[in-house]
Every structure is written in C-alpha cells, then in structure tokens.
A protein has these predicted regions:
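Short, amphipathic alpha-helical interaction segments positioned at domain boundaries
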Residues: 108-170
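Extended interaction regions within the primary functional domain
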Residues: 60-61, 66-73, 84, 103-104, ...
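Short amphipathic alpha-helical interface segments
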Residues: 17-79
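Short, hydrophobic/aromatic alpha-helical segments in well-folded domains
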Residues: 24-28, 89, 143
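Eukaryotic partner-binding/assembly regions in large regulatory complexes
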Residues: 1-26
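Short amphipathic alpha-helical interaction segments
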Residues: 76-111, 117
Length: 171
C-alpha cells in the first residue's frame, strides 16, 4: 500500500502527465444502469430537479411522519425504462458521489406545481389526511458534473437514429 501511495505522489509531481479524467470514472461507468445514464443526462442538460416529501401535518411538527419521501418526475422526464426503479437509481447515483439530495427547494415554482399535481403525490396527500409538502431538490455534485461532461454525450441522436432504423427494419 505504501508503494502505491508513493507512486501516486510521484505521478502528482509530474507536470507533464495529462490526466483528463478521474481514475474512478471507468469503474463508475461499469456500475451504472442504462437508465441511470439517462437520469444523469437529464441533470446535465436540465439542471437540478424538483423533489417533494409528503408528511402528515401536526402543530409545531411534533409527531409528524413522512408518508412519501422523495417523490419526483425524474423517471418520466429522463425517459427511463423502469420507472419503479428510480428511487434505487437515485440512491446508487448518490452512493457514487454523482448527485446530491438537497434540503433547499428550487426557485422554479411551476416545477413544483406540476409535481404536486401528479397522481402519486395526490395519493400520498390523501393517505396522510392533513398533509404538508416539503419541497426539496436533487442536483449534480461538481464530481457528477465533470463525470457527465467527460463520459456522457449531451444527446444520443446517433443512437436513436440507429434504434429507429432497426425498428423500421424489423417491421
């Protein structure tokens, strides 16, 4: 281990060495599902995303409980294949250091209005009785921003064209 540490320090002293990408990026790519790449592209192209928690309402918040945490529209907006896996995808992206769950809301009121009108949010509010919505946000970390810039194409028009050709050929 000491040799590896010494090697790292020696490489860091070499001003001629070019390290375009963090060494973890290769491993991270192998630990991502295709839907997670779509989610990252959504964050890279559209910025932070709205999230809400539905809680029971109690005076002074004493005894209030979270009925439905982390409700978002990230799955549909990213075009993921497995919508029910979005919470697991987000947890994995957080584990990898690519996204951050912020307690701060976005300044984008319409994003929350659309999110709060979704059936899963409305259902959670009904089940909570007197409900309170806590607005939050999810965003890329600086590490995630760099990862997306270096590893993910901004668009997949070429890939989508190939998929469309394959679909047309099979009919």
């Amino acid at each position: 281990m000491r040799e590896r540490g010494a090697d790292l320090l020696n490489r860091s002293a070499d001003v001629r060495a070019l390290d375009d990408a963090h060494p973890a990026y290769d491993r991270i790519l192998s630990e991502l599902a295709p839907d997670e790449a779509r989610i990252l592209r959504l964050f890279a192209n559209s910025g932070p995303q709205a999230a809400v928690d539905v809680r029971t309402w109690r005076p002074l918040d004493v005894g209030a409980q979270t009925v439905a945490p982390g409700l978002t529209m990230i799955g549909p907006r990213a075009g993921v294949r497995y919508i029910d896996r979005v919470p697991a995808y987000l947890n994995n992206l957080f584990r990898l250091g690519l996204i951050w769950f912020s307690h701060d809301p976005l300044d984008d009121l319409p994003a929350y209005q659309v999110l709060e009108a979704q059936p899963d949010v409305l259902g959670a509010m009904r089940s909570a009785g007197r409900a309170r919505i806590v607005r939050r946000s999810i965003l890329l970390t600086p590490f995630g921003t760099d990862f997306c810039a270096l590893c993910l194409p901004a668009t997949t028009a070429g890939f989508e064209a190939v998929a469309a050709e394959a679909a047309a050929a099979s009919t």
